[in-house]
Amino acid sequence: MPGLTIGDTIPDLEVDTTQGKIKLHHFCSDSWTILFSHPGDFTPVCTTELGKMAQYASEFNKRGVMLLGMSCDDLESHKEWIKDIEAHTPGAKVNYPIISDPKREIIKQLNMVDPDEKDSNGNLPSRALHIVGPDKKIKLSFLYPAQTGRNMDEVLRVVESLQKASKYKIATPANWKPGEPVVISPDVTNDQAKEMFPQGFKTADLPSKKEYLRFTNV
């Protein structure tokens, strides 16, 4: 589906939320932001997802990440539904704002439309999630179908990966978890790597004898 994608700057839209009107760029400020949509209020998967997002809010906050939800339901619906979300996930408080987009214009501008899920008013939002960097650019996007809930451990994992890669010349390998070794970017020479990573690094001994797979801890 064409539209906003990785590397694009999010539009500076003014939106109505459960915490009042906000401008997206002002809300994001210089922080990392998770902007996520859900198909509808008072639905089973969405209730579990937003509850888990609230449950993980302290972990995102530790990493300087703002949370912003969205669907096409009205604000009163959002506010009533929050009671169910918090009841289903004891101890979790939905303290992040949720955008109301009844005209379904914002989901189109943010590329969060599900082409297969519709109601009488048109296409519903997908289970989309954009991770936006401090520069207001999209760094990563998830697009899940209505039938599959998102995994907050994975969201937290990729946030850590993106933040480390923005600070160091590294990437995270397959199945990487926070605390595990990362790989040094291939455009970094060994001499440069010695300066950048004084803690040292280990080069994999490969049949090709090429020294491109170098592990370090950051």
Curated annotation (Swiss-Prot):
GO MF terms listed in the record are: thioredoxin-dependent peroxiredoxin activity
Question: Mind telling me which InterPro entries this protein's record contains?
Answer: AhpC/TSA (IPR000866), Peroxiredoxin_AhpC-typ (IPR024706), Peroxiredoxin_C (IPR019479), PRX_1cys (IPR045020), Thioredoxin-like_sf (IPR036249), Thioredoxin_domain (IPR013766)
* Catalyzed reactions: a hydroperoxide + [thioredoxin]-dithiol = an alcohol + [thioredoxin]-disulfide + H2O
Q: Where is this motif: Bipartite nuclear localization signal?
A: 194-217
Additional free-text comment from the UniProt record = The active site is a conserved redox-active cysteine residue, the peroxidatic cysteine (C(P)), which makes the nucleophilic attack on the peroxide substrate. The peroxide oxidizes the C(P)-SH to cysteine sulfenic acid (C(P)-SOH), which then reacts with another cysteine residue, the resolving cysteine (C(R)), to form a disulfide bridge. The disulfide is subsequently reduced by an appropriate electron donor to complete the catalytic cycle. In this 1-Cys peroxiredoxin, no C(R) is present and C(P) instead forms a disulfide with a cysteine from another protein or with a small thiol molecule.
Q: What does this protein do?
A: Thiol-specific peroxidase that catalyzes the reduction of hydrogen peroxide and organic hydroperoxides to water and alcohols, respectively. Seems to contribute to the inhibition of germination during stress.
Q: What is this protein called?
A: 1-Cys peroxiredoxin
